[in-house]
Amino acid sequence: MENNYNSFYHLQIAKCGGTYLNNMIVHQLFNILKNNDISYIDGEYHLGWKEIENNYVVSSLRDPVKRTVSHYAYWKNGGQDGAIPKNIPSFMVWVERNTDFISNYQIKNFLYERKNFHLNPFDPRGVDPDFLTIKINKNLAFDRIKRVNVLLKDTQLNYQTCDTVMKKTLKDFNIKDSFYIDNEKKYDHNITKSSTELYNSLTKQDIDYLYNLNSLDSEIYFSQSVYFNAKDF
């Protein structure tokens, strides 16, 4: 069957396992696609949705509570090459102050398209106003999520699944190049000790509050039908 895809995009959502996916398969995929004259879009800049015809999209979602905790821990430690914030508030205070930014963060990435590279959808200190003012359109967001070719749940981020995803993606592009994933190497999930400790310290009330704050993220995260299933490949 003739392949209709002419570009590849990793829709990388902050603190959702994108670094792991990049290290496992995406960087290698980029090189293979380039050698086969297939264009690709580098999603490491958290670009949001890209409305491109015949675009092959890969993405991953994370438990909304763990994602929010990880976002705070990353920000608290200065992020990537950033200054460590002064007068750091507690986690729950930070969440309350940044509700417009942090709530349903994953869904927003399917409704947002980054246009200004001097601003970003990641750091509350310099966040893109376009991200903060997104009007949530559940139907549109869910429709776009269903259009993702390979959507992985955080619990699927392992060697076996990534190996299958790599095979599927190359097959979908009608590419027969070989690839290699070192299953002995510990690929970076970019999860810090402080993030894990903070999550483990949350009360049930905290967790319930965060799931409710991220109600649409929670709905799609726990919807098993949207995720990649190796049995279908």
Where do the model's predicted regions map?
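Membrane-interface amphipathic segments in extracytoplasmic regions
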Residues: M1-F233
